Regions:
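Conserved active-site segments centered on acidic
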Residues: 125-129
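Catalytic cysteine-centered active loop of the rhodanese-like fold, especially the PTP/DSP P-loop
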Residues: 61-116
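Single conserved hydrophobic/aromatic residue that forms the stacking wall/gate
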Residues: 134-143
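Positively charged, proline/Ser/Thr-rich regional signature most characteristic
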Residues: 2-81
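Long, charge-dense
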Residues: 118-122
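Structural signal for conserved beta-strand scaffold positions within catalytic alpha/beta enzyme cores
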Residues: 20, 46-48, 86, 114, ...
Length: 143
């Protein structure tokens, strides 16, 4: 897994797809999407780990089928040749799970990275944040 530093992302905000994949254990009473709506890195797209996992299983967060994955990333406006930076604001390292999903489904491992330190480090360094929700462009071909 490749990490990128906050300095690098700050200089390349408009050249990459940024994904907030914050997920919290249920007992914490924290909800990743609710936190995303209040604060996130500019241009970040929220990836809902619960919503984007297989539904017809008793096990949590199982991978969806390839066709379902392609629909998910297409709706997010992501193509196979996009450089992707994934981060989270959680203690369970959900960004790594999201990274795994992209690699498992064939996205080039040199194009998918995790932000070192996540949102906590980004905010601690007083970098630009927003509450504006990302609006996905029309779905694209993800193949």
């Amino acid at each position: 897994m490749s990490l990128v530093e906050t300095d690098w992302l700050d200089q390349n905000l408009n050249d990459v797809k940024i994904i907030d994949c914050s997920w919290h254990m249920p007992q914490t009473k924290r909800v990743g999407f609710e936190e995303y709506k209040k604060v996130h890195i500019p241009n970040a797209i929220f990836f809902d780990l619960d919503k984007n996992s297989k539904k017809n299983t008793s096990l949590p967060h199982m991978l969806v089928e390839k066709a379902d994955w392609e629909e998910i990333v297409s709706k997010m406006g992501i193509k196979n040749d996009d450089k992707i930076i994934i981060y989270d604001n959680s203690d369970v390292i959900s960004s790594c799970r999201c990274w795994f999903n992209f690699i498992y489904f064939g996205h080039n491992s040199e194009m998918v990275h995790v932000l070192n330190g996540g949102l906590k480090k980004w905010i601690k360094e007083k970098r630009k944040i927003t509450c504006l929700l990302y609006t996905s462009p029309s779905p694209r071909d993800t193949r």
